[in-house]
Amino acid sequence: MSRLQDVVVNEMKVKKQIDSVEEIQEIKQFIKAYVKSHSFIQTLVLGISGGQDSTLTGKLAQLAVNELKEEGRNCKFIAVKLPYGVQQDAHEVEDALEFINPDTTYTVNIKPAVDQSVQSLSEAGIKLTDFQKGNEKARERMKVQFSIASNTQGIVLGTDHSAENITGFYTKYGDGAADIAPIFGLNKRQGKQLLAYLGAPKHLYEKVPTADLEDDKPQLPDEEALGVSYHDIDDYLEGKEIPGTARETIEKHYVRNAHKRELAYTRYSWPKYNK
C-alpha cells in the first residue's frame, strides 16, 4: 500500500469487512445520539432518488426514528421526492419508498426553479453548460431539503459514503451538503451488503449507479463519468492492491477534489495559499 493510499484509507474509515448487524446498529446509534444531543430536532429530512445510497440512508433513518419514538422522543422521518419534471426511473423511487416506509413524504418538482435560474443567468449573459445545469439541479434539491428541515425543525441527512467521498463525486453545496452523513465509512459494496441484509428489493442496489443530472447524457453511469470502477475504488478503500491506472485515477480524483471535503478556506487554513 502506497503512502497516499494509507492516508486515504485512514481518512475514509472503511473497514476491510463488516458485520451487517453490527454496522446497522452502529449507524442507527449514531443517528439517535445526534438527535438526542440536539433538543430542537423534530424531523430528519432526506431526498429519495431510487438509488442505493438514498435507499439505505432512508431505511436506516426510519429505523432509528422508530426506536426514538419507542423511547419517547417525538420525531419523524421525512422523505422527499425531487423530480426534474418527469423522472425516468420514478418507479424505482416508489419502490424505495415502499421499502423505507417513511413517516411523511413530500414531492417537490424542481424543474420550474432550475429552469428559471438558468434563464435568469442567461439573461444576465451567463450561459450555463449542460453539466453546470446539472449542478443547479443538485443544489436546488438540497435547497428544498433544507427549506423543509427549517420549516419542520429538522436536519438534512446526506448520502455521502466513502467511495463517493474519495472521488469527490458529488456537487459542492449540492448533494454534498448535509447536517450529518450516516453512511460515511462504508464503500459501495458494503452499502449493497446492508441493503441485502435489510431485505431491500434487489433492483435498487443492483442497478447501475448514476447521478442522472445531465440532460444531454441521461442515466450516465457513475463509473463511466469517473473513469474507474466501484470494484477498484472499494478495493482501494479496503487497503488492497489495484491496477496502477485505476490507482492513479482514484488518487487524482482525491487530490483534485480536496476542496469539496473542506469548509471554506480562510487565511488560517492549510496549505497557506497566501504565501
Curated annotation (Swiss-Prot):
Binding site for ATP: G47, I48, S49, G50, G51, Q52, D53, S54, T159, K188, T210
GO MF, one annotated term: NAD+ synthase activity
Signal peptide interval: none
Function: Catalyzes the ATP-dependent amidation of deamido-NAD to form NAD. Uses ammonia as a nitrogen source.
Claim: Magnesium is one of the keywords in the record: yes
Database matches in Gene3D superfamilies: HUPs
Protein encoded by which gene: nadE
Annotated keywords: ATP-binding, Ligase, Magnesium, Metal-binding, NAD, Nucleotide-binding
PANTHER family: NH 3 /GLUTAMINE-DEPENDENT NAD + SYNTHETASE, NH(3)-DEPENDENT NAD(+) SYNTHETASE
Domain of life: Bacteria
Gene Ontology annotations for the cellular component aspect, listed alphabetically: cytoplasm
Binding positions for deamido-NAD(+) per the UniProt entry: R139, K172, D179, H259, K260
InterPro entries with a match to the protein in the record: NAD/GMP_synthase, NAD_synthase, NH(3)-dep_NAD(+)_synth, Rossmann-like_a/b/a_fold
Biological or metabolic pathway of the protein: Cofactor biosynthesis; NAD(+) biosynthesis; NAD(+) from deamido-NAD(+) (ammonia route): step 1/1
Entry similarity comment: Belongs to the NAD synthetase family.
Subunit (UniProt): Homodimer.
E.C. number: 6.3.1.5
Cysteine disulfide partners in this protein: none
Identification of the protein by name: NH(3)-dependent NAD(+) synthetase
Catalysed reactions, semicolon-separated: deamido-NAD(+) + NH4(+) + ATP = AMP + diphosphate + NAD(+) + H(+)
One GO-annotated biological process of the protein: NAD biosynthetic process
Binding residue positions for Mg(2+): D53, E164
Classification via NCBIfam families: nadE (TIGR00552), PRK00768.1 (NF001979)
One Pfam family in the UniProt entry: NAD_synthase
